[in-house]
């Protein structure tokens, strides 16, 4: 049992409470060998540079414990009220060396997560357990852990993930030389493990309690020695560190006020001049020339790169001088750099609101030209003579208002205003800006040096002087003061800056655009003969000295060159021009006689400001083009004006205007210098980032030569207006223009970039290993150099757990790209259930098509790229919109991530279904196994299955060859039965056998009707011979001819008879078929009508598919088109705006573009999120339909098609699923009056009978009898007693209630109308969704319009066909065959005389014989009687009687 008591108080600042038992003893820290190096090495881990530093933290300066138990079981120690916990390996005096170590477990409790440090036991005894090699630190959400059963393998179950596990080495020989520990606060945890520190960004509520598990005594000889010593720390302590010439020294800092102030305000810059993490930025402010930021995160260019930090305890009375150029950094703390100093920051590092500066304080600013201006403040309104009195700038809290002036030679030049009530920082830039607490208090000419005299007063505070340079950084501001800085100096930090967060969560982020910097200028113009004009504008300034300020006289003069004896207007008449300004300055005292030079504070220069023109004066020579350009001193006819001002050391005054008359075009161009003559002034810098001006279109990009040939056009743009390419008219070569850097998505895991997805195959973000996917290139820290996986799709052999996912792919911690594991199923189960429908009497089967969207294509938008297109100045302006881009990008990313998770959990993959989905594999032998494996299959590897339907080759030839068809004429005639075949077989091909081989058909002699040439010659000769020899009794020669003729005539007559019979049979059969055809066409008409409806349904489904697929493309297309909108700016091109205007004027114009484009992005994101919400509901509907329609049979009428559901099939479709519902549609109904039950009485009681089966309906027929019928089909039958259930009574109870009370009566009651209304109210937007018209967009675009129109046309055509078929059926019914019968002549042929003679002879011969046989034979016949008599007389004595002999069988 563990007894928790209070055992120890450490009375420094707080206390530590712990368990008390005899197992734990205090250990003198000096008894730990090597301990003198532990603290030093520990403190100097993050202090790598030279200098002095005070660090504070929960360091191991308290009591060490050595805990062990003599029991066999483990024991626990509980630490409370601590902020850090440390432990060390066994290193006791007189230790036996390699002692048997015990397991260690440290559990730091918190919410929602806790920390567990676990080290397993190590031994090398007979049990052969290996020496301990590793320990583990992990983050867990488990509130409680079973310490007794906790093993080294169980950490996989309780740790959150690989990004929250830190394995570390623990070697027994490191006794006392390594310090292990944990220090935590609400924002992060620092783990000191194996000479390394790990910072884990964890936002957590820590209970400041630690549970320690320790084991029984080891084999070390020292009493109560154990494997580890422990220390819980509750006190915050400071150490003063010093590192000089490689020598390290440290000491405990005991002056609390000094140590606190030093640690808070002094730091040692790291390599590169960066301020280290953890610095408090006490009294550091963000410098601004306009309004001051109160709170938020901003990416800005600030003087935060420290070249030298000089901690100054105090100044003497003597003045100190600080110069920007040639500064000698001899007292720097930390590194010192030789960079150009932009701003010197004086940080007044006091911790209490006291007045620090007590002496005379005057800031002297040595400006350009040697003029020294002084800034001082006074506690009261003073006269001019009083400026020579003692002024001051009190540092800290002032005791009253202070009025500040700019002085020159003791005379006030300008009143600056009232000093802030508390001065904590003064920053002065070399460009003449003077900041107090970050606010631009005063601006003048550039400054060379600063001097002031100051004493620190009575507060004892000290200064830090920081020589800084401007750098881009993410600055977190709270209450106008800097709290945290993240430098945008690396790839990962650039992403942090673009996302406006110092801590990146795991995910995909758009890669920030890189700074282009100074690049070459490319210009493309049409070749022309150029004439040049130089326009010299002269400005004569007249300056006067007022009481407190220098003013420009309105008599200052502006002079234009003379043109046509006119000096008021000057127009450009050449096609090139350059504008130059020359200014002079004269001064006077109080009159208007300007005859003195402008010296000292009267020195002024003339500047021409933008005014109302859409371009700046100093950009006119930057290849701006016009059709007309004139300068005028009068406003008549002017399009805009330029302001002319005098700039002095203290202010800037507008004293006149220069008016401009212009027309936009390309005829006149402003150039930096004279290039007159016949020239092609085009200058191209190929294959490198360049600032271009191509035919008046400006921007930054890479120009490359292409092989394309385009006949028309000079330049080519996208829908958004961006330049895609141009053509050189001299040689016709077409060049492409691409951005200097392309947008990419970086995969960030655990604060580091592990991979990036990009559209081009080019190294980026320092990643060199790459692979390809169907949609993008992927660069990674994972080694994709193997030939097997480089340049291929995702490597399926990579086995790792993805940390982040994008669509169906994931990225592991090692940067490898893997497929998301999908859930597999073995097969589909499709149970069948009865539907709930009306009572139809007849059905028709219909297939109805339904499409349901399941997912949307994830969209990632690089907001900064969309808004600014990589323009660095625009990117800086964009940071003023705080987290606008971050919100847009995170909304899309989180929506895509959520949808991806839902889809992954929804979809299952069946391997069988996946195989059958392939047309090539559908009929393959493997998939048809075992039924068709032994048979050839159609559609598989061969077409053997067709052999049974091909004509077979017979061995006996029944046809002529092709050669015979060529050599002989083929005559086809109608024949009688087998007459022709018998004739051919008998004749054997001999023509002379014609008459001999005559055949007989129904007793009539016939010959085939066709005779060849030989037969005709033969019979002609017979006829001729008969005619010639007729007088000589030779007419018999013509007999063969006559017989043959008659035989062939008989053949024809018999043919006619057969034809007549066939004609009658055909007519009867055709008339009978007409009725069948009429019925068939009626059914075809119905089928086509149903097909027409089906095609219409398919067309609607395809239209929905097209709408779903193209909706996102339409939105993206509209989003792209918005880039052409200038949103009331002078141009939609940011580069063009900065090319025309000065920076301040251009910022105002670009701000309009940023606002408009962010609004368009917000509208797109809102529409996308709304669409995702709709798809989420649609996805659930699809899931329900798969379960109810595909995997079972729905009982709901209309849910799975409009009818009684039979079965459904589902198939994949773009972005969703398409269902084919087979349903029964009732075509006829039987209307019955249904009864809910029967109420009966027998006099003494009343009871009710209700139908037991709810699938049956009880109704009363017209014959007054009751019947039962199923509700799915009208099949009435007489009810039986087994169909009813008796109930107690017949009373029906109705409950009166409102709709509001229904849920309390029926818990699952849902008011559909009210629910829909509530949903509409909840999802009603408070913004206006813009109309997103359909436009062509360079993205995946599904154009099914033609197919849908074709389906609709076919459906309409089928409908028209049904109408035509109806008419045709009527015509067929009226068309019956009525054939005219051919006359059939029956001729009876008499038998010849010899036949009758033969018949008579047969009769004469046969009748006597028959009579004789009948009358004379037999036992009673005459012959029989006579024979008997003769036999008895003649044979009586010859034959004796004998006994019959029987058969004898011998065996």
Swiss-Prot record:
Species: Canine coronavirus (strain Insavc-1)
Transmembrane segments: 1393-1412
Family to which this protein belongs: Belongs to the alphacoronaviruses spike protein family.
Membrane-related topology note: Single-pass type I membrane protein
UniProt entry tagged with the keyword Zinc-finger: no
Region (Heptad repeat 2 (HR2)), start-end ranges: 1307-1404
UniProt remark on domains: The KxHxx motif seems to function as an ER retrieval signal.
Protein name: Spike glycoprotein
Region (S1): 32-779
Virion surface side: 32-1392
Region (S2) residue spans: 780-1451
Short motif KxHxx, span: 1447-1451
UniProt gene name: S
Stretches in topological domain Intravirion: 1413-1451
Subcellular location: Virion membrane; Host endoplasmic reticulum-Golgi intermediate compartment membrane
């Amino acid at each position: 049992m563990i007894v928790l008591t209070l055992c120890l108080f450490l009375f420094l600042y707080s206390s530590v409470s712990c368990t008390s038992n005899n197992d734990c003893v205090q250990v003198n820290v000096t008894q730990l060998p090597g301990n003198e190096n532990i603290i030093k090495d520990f403190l100097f881990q993050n202090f790598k540079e030279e200098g002095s530093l005070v660090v504070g933290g929960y360091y191991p300066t308290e009591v060490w414990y050595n805990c062990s138990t003599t029991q066999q079981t483990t024991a626990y120690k509980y630490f409370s009220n601590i902020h850090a916990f440390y432990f060390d390996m066994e290193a006791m005096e007189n230790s036996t060396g390699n002692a048997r170590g015990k397991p260690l477990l440290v559990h730091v409790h918190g919410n929602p997560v806790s920390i567990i440090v676990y080290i397993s036991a190590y031994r090398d005894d007979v049990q052969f357990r290996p020496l301990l090699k590793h320990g583990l630190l992990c983050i867990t959400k488990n509130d409680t852990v079973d310490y007794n059963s906790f093993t080294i393998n169980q950490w996989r179950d309780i740790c959150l993930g690989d990004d929250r596990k830190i394995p570390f080495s623990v070697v027994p020989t490191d006794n006392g030389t390594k310090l292990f520990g944990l220090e935590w606060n609400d924002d992060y945890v620092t783990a000191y493990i194996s000479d390394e520190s790990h910072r884990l960004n964890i936002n957590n509520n820590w209970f400041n309690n630690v549970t320690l598990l320790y084991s029984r005594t080891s084999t070390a000889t020292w009493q109560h020695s154990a494997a580890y010593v422990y220390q819980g720390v509750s006190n915050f302590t400071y150490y003063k560190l010093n590192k000089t010439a490689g020598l390290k020294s440290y000491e405990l800092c005991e002056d609390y006020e000094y140590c606190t102030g030093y640690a808070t305000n002094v730091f040692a810059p790291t390599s590169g001049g960066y301020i280290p993490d953890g610095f408090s930025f006490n009294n550091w402010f963000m410098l601004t020339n306009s309004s001051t930021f109160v709170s938020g995160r901003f990416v800005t260019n600030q003087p935060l790169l420290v070249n030298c930090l000089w901690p100054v305890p105090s100044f003497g009375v003597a003045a100190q001088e600080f110069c920007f150029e040639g500064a000698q950094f001899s007292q720097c703390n930390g590194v010192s750099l030789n960079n150009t100093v932009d701003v010197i920051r004086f940080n007044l590092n006091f911790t209490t609101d006291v007045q620090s500066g007590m002496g005379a304080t005057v800031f002297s600013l040595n400006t350009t030209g040697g003029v020294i201006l002084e800034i001082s403040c006074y506690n009261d309104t003073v006269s001019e003579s009083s400026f020579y009195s003692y002024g001051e700038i009190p540092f800290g809290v002032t005791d009253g208002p202070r009025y500040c002036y700019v002085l020159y030679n003791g005379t006030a030049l300008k009143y600056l205003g009232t000093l802030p009530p508390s001065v904590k920082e003064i920053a002065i830039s070399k460009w003449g800006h003077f900041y107090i607490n970050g606010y631009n208090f005063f601006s003048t000419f550039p400054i060379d040096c600063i001097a002031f005299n100051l004493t620190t007063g009575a507060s004892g505070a000290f200064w830090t002087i920081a020589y800084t340079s401007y750098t881009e950084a993410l600055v977190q501001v709270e209450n106008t003061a800097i709290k945290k800085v993240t430098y945008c100096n690396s790839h990962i930090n650039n992403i942090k800056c673009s996302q406006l967060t110092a801590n990146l969560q795991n995910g995909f982020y758009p890669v920030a655009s890189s700074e282009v910097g100074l690049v070459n200028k490319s210009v493309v113009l049409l070749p022309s003969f150029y004439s040049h004009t130089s326009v010299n504008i002269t400005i004569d300034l007249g300056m006067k000295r007022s009481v407190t300020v220098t003013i420009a006289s309105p008599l200052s003069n502006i002079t234009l060159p003379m043109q046509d004896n006119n000096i008021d207007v000057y127009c450009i008449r050449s096609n090139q021009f350059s504008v130059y300004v020359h200014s002079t300055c004269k001064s006077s005292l109080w009159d208007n006689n300007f005859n003195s030079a402008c010296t000292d504070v009267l020195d002024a220069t003339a500047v021409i400001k933008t005014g109302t023109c859409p371009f700046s004066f100093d950009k006119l020579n930057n290849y701006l083009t016009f059709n007309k350009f004139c300068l005028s001193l009068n406003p008549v006819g002017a399009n805009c004006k330029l302001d002319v001002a005098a700039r002095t050391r203290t202010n800037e005054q507008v004293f006149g205007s220069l008016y401009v008359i212009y027309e936009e075009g390309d005829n006149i161009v402003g150039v930096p210098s004279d290039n007159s003559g016949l020239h092609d002034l085009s200058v191209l810098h190929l294959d490198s980032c360049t600032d271009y001006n191509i035919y008046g279109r400006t921007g930054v990009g890479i120009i490359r030569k292409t092989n394309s040939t385009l006949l028309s056009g000079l330049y080519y743009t996208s829908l958004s207006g961006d330049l895609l390419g141009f053509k050189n008219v001299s040689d016709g070569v077409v060049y492409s223009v691409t951005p200097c850097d392309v947008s990419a998505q970086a995969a960030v895991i655990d604060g580091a970039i592990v991979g990036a997805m990009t559209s081009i195959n080019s190294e980026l973000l320092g990643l060199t290993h790459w692979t390809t996917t169907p949609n993008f290139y992927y660069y990674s820290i994972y080694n994709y150099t193997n030939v097997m996986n480089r340049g291929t799709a995702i490597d399926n052999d990579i086995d790792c757990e993805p940390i982040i996912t994008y669509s169906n792919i994931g990225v592991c911690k090692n940067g490898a790209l893997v497929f998301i594991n999908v859930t597999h199923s073995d097969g589909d189960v499709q149970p069948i259930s009865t539907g709930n429908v009306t009572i139809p009497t007849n059905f028709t089967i219909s297939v109805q098509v339904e499409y349901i969207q399941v997912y949307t294509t994830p969209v990632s938008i690089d907001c900064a790229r969309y808004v600014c297109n990589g323009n660095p100045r625009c990117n800086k302006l964009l940071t003023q919109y705080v987290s606008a881009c971050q919100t847009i990008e995170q909304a899309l990313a989180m929506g895509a991530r959520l949808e991806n998770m839902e889809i992954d959990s929804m979809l299952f993959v069946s391997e069988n279904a996946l195989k059958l989905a392939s047309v090539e594999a559908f009929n393959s032998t493997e998939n048809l196994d075992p039924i068709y494996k032994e048979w050839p299959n159609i559609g598989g590897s061969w077409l053997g299955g067709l052999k049974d339907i091909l004509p077979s080759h017979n061995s006996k030839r029944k046809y002529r060859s092709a050669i015979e068809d060529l050599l002989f004429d083929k005559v086809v005639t109608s024949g009688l039965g087998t007459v022709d075949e018998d004739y051919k077989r008998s004749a054997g091909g001999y023509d002379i056998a014609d008459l001999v081989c005559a055949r007989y058909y129904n007793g009539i002699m016939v010959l085939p009707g066709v005779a060849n040439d030989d037969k005709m010659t033969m019979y002609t000769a017979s006829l001729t011979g008969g005619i010639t020899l007729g007088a000589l009794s030779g007419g018999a020669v013509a007999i063969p001819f006559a017989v043959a003729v008659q035989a062939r005539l008989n053949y024809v007559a018999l043919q006619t008879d057969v034809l007549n019979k066939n004609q009658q049979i055909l007519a009867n059969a055709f008339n009978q078929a007409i009725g069948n055809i009429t019925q068939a066409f009626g059914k075809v008409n119905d089928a086509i009508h149903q097909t027409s409806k089906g095609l219409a349904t398919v067309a609607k489904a395809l239209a929905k598919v097209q709408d779903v697929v193209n909706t996102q493309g339409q939105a993206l297309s509209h989003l792209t088109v918005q880039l052409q909108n200038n949103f009331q700016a002078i141009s939609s091109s940011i580069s063009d705006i900065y090319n025309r205007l000065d920076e301040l004027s251009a910022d105002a114009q670009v701000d309009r573009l940023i606002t408009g484009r962010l609004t368009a992005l917000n509208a797109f994101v809102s529409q996308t999120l709304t669409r995702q919400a709709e798809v989420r509901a649609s996805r659930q509907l699809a899931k329900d339909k798969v379960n109810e329609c595909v995997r079972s049979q729905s009982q709901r009428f209309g849910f799975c098609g409009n009818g009684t559901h039979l079965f459904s099939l589902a198939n994949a479709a773009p972005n969703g699923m398409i269902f084919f519902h087979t349903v029964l549609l009732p075509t006829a109904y039987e209307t019955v009056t249904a009864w809910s039950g029967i109420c009966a009485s027998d006099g003494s009681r009343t009871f009710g009978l209700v139908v037991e089966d709810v699938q049956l309906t009880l109704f009363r027929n017209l014959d007054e009898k009751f019947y039962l019928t199923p509700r799915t089909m009208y099949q009435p039958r007489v009810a039986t007693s087994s169909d009813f259930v008796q109930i107690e009574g017949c009373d029906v109870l109705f409950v009166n209630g409102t709709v509001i009370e229904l849920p309390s009566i029926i818990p699952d009651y849902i008011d559909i109308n009210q629910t829909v209304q509530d949903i509409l109210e909840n999802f009603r937007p408070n913004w206006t969704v813009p109309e997103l018209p359909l436009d062509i967009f360079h993205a995946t675009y599904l154009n099914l319009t033609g197919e849908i129109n074709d389906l609709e046309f076919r459906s309409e055509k089928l409908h028209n066909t049904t109408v035509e078929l109806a008419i045709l059926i009527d015509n067929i019914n009226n068309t019956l065959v009525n054939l005219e019968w051919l006359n059939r002549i029956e001729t009876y042929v008499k038998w010849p005389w010899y036949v009758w003679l033969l018949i008579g002879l047969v009769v004469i011969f046969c009748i006597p014989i028959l009579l004789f046989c009948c009358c004379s034979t037999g036992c009673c016949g005459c012959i029989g009687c006579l024979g008997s008599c003769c036999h008895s007389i003649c044979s009586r004595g010859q034959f004796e009687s004998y006994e019959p002999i029987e058969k004898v069988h011998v065996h």
